[in-house]
């Protein structure tokens, strides 16, 4: 039907540089290696309706980027084959954003937008007028959640590096 043709045609696109817009982060690996993705990374790729043979752009978030292809799709996840390492271009400037803790989901918005804009490090602090106050137990949980949000935002915008979420300061 026409709807299926349209859905298939817009499965994913390539950028001006020829890179696939399907970007995922994987551990550092070697060329010609097969990597199994499950969980959130697999769900991110499933959203693009991948097919075996589709190109995927991978990175380790630190210093390596990889050109790869989808080998096999199973109900448990996706197997991708790393074809080659791609030269990594470091950012021209290291930008650190210091932001006061905000209430609600506003911190999530700050992390997403600053990641998309290329910020290298995000440090949240508690100011005198902050409504949100965190005890030591909550700080670790929040930092993990913020790192997860930054990773998702970096995958969404196709960024090469992951921003560092600094320790909470007073």
What are these regions (language model features)?
Residues 2-13:
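Extreme N-terminal basic, low-complexity initiation segments
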Residues 10-11, 72, 154, 158:
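Short intrinsically disordered, low-complexity segments
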Residues 88-170:
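RNA substrate-binding interface of SAM-dependent RNA methyltransferases
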Residues 3-4, 39, 136:
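Residues at structural and domain junctions
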Residues 12-88, 139:
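N-terminal positively charged helical leader segments and presequences
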